[in-house]
Amino acid sequence: MKLGLMFVNSGPFSNPTLLAHLATTAERCGIESLWTVEHVVIPENYQSPYPYSSSGKIPGGEDVSIPDPLLPLTFIAALTKKVKLATGVLILPQRHPLYVAKEMATLDALSNGRAILGIGSGWLKEEFDSLGLDFHTRGARTDESIKAMRALWSEGASSFHGKHFNFGPVKCYPKPVQKGGVPIHVGGHSTAAAKRAGRYGDGFFPALGEIPKLKELFGVMKAEAEKAGRNPASIELSTMGRPRVDDLKALQDIGVSRVVIAPPAFDVEGLTRGLEKLQNEVIAKI
């Protein structure tokens, strides 16, 4: 079982000193991966329900600091040697896949093969409206983007011709260090996300769900993978959870190999104490 930290670019971690301490201490204490989140803007008085809180609102309110998800990972890459650098999640249909493919390949090269691209299709309609994008075609654009990026990460020139994206032949360098390209982990806890992970994902990351719900989603993912002629066992399963040994082992029993948690504190001393406690009381026992 691997343990990751979520929200490493948001709130107080937009401070470079605190982010640097979080990254280096997390690596020293055995944290496997660091995950960033994304919203390019948060429209005032939005009505779309945030799916990960009972209030339906983003924690921290509309004024919460959410830096770009990729630049902090590049910052972390320069300070660390082995911790994985992940987006959790990047809102893929808000970006052109040519740019995402270039950025992720660059991050993978600079970090010597440590990048993970966690992607979501988005929930905040007003954010799509602000960008001039059609919220209702986000699923189709997400699917095309995954296929387009994989084409760009292949050797030589590449082309893609879809309804939403059309290019090529073009060349795009550098290529990712990781063979086969940067791993793409599909986020979300909907049936559509589970099916997308089964068809296209290197990983599936439903951030919410008790074990019965996760088992249901994993079943949907596995059935879709088999339908697509893929081996479901090749798709890595991650989720968010609590850093308790019994809880982690229960998740491991249903196939989860990574659990991502919130940072244990938001100050230097608290992070040091909290991460060392995780190392001694949790990581050492899983």
Language model features with spans:
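Active-site-adjacent structural elements that line small-molecule/cofactor binding pockets in enzymes
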Residues: 1-286
